[in-house]
């Protein structure tokens, strides 16, 4: 893997520049800028309908400095596969506008609605056909662009407009899909979770993903101040707490001889080695209005215990897979 340093990345021009209309404090712009810093040269981006798409391409303006294609909600991976196949054909025939470039990075961005739910069929097929591209999941844990509706990525207990917290039902009643495990089960060569609170880790993982010959998957937690109900200046802080509480652990998974090999990233490895440093789930939930029913009008110990036990179990399983 090519060396990545913060100094070099800071000097590299941004692929996503000013003019975006995303909400104040939106983590998606941070994720995209960090991931795009890791590209090697000519790059083509496909973008599913969602917050990032509608806010960076308001006609007749664009915030993108690279070729960029707006896709439907459900087909961003399919469009990326078509681009990648076209590039291969140009290289094989040694003709066409992209034939002169030895490498053209293809990156697909989509939210959790376009990944967990509406776009999963296309994503699954594109991975199994082994197209060479990097898929970046920008997970803000709901359909934020259309009004904060629950998605397959919405966590247990979260209050949304379609899973409102009330006296009878305390927010979403189901757990979120284990999307990373689902993608790993496809035999995907490289899967990693990323968090903008650790920018160098993001860029190193993005470069690893891009350099792999085949489909790769980056899963970014993208805190949403509007949907999660926290002050916009706390975006990175809330994201950091997600990892420090093991709600969103950081790891990598690569395939070796047909077997998935897990490796915890530094922030999560430190917790595995020193379990007492793991923060309780309340530290994360208390920051967000979507979970205020866990604490008001009275503290709901049963809900907190259920969620804490679920997180602890998933964390223990991940540590076992990583051999720590």
Give the positions of each predicted feature.
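Short gly/pro/ser/thr-enriched loop/turn and capping motifs at secondary-structure boundaries
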Residues: 53, 140-145, 225-227
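A structural motif
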Residues: 170-188
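Active-site glycine- and acidic-residue-rich loops that bind
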Residues: 113-117, 195-203
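Short, conserved beta-strand edge motifs with alternating hydrophobic and charged residues
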Residues: 137, 192-194, 217-221
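Glycine/aspartate-rich loop-and-adjacent alpha/beta segment that forms the canonical ThDP
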Residues: 202-324
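Ligand/cofactor pocket segment of small-molecule handling proteins
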Residues: 167-171, 188, 193, 206
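Acidic, Ser/Thr-rich peripheral helices and adjacent loops at domain boundaries
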Residues: 152-172, 235-249
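Cofactor-binding active-site loop characterized by glycine-rich and histidine/acidic residues
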Residues: 3-135, 148-158, 172, 185
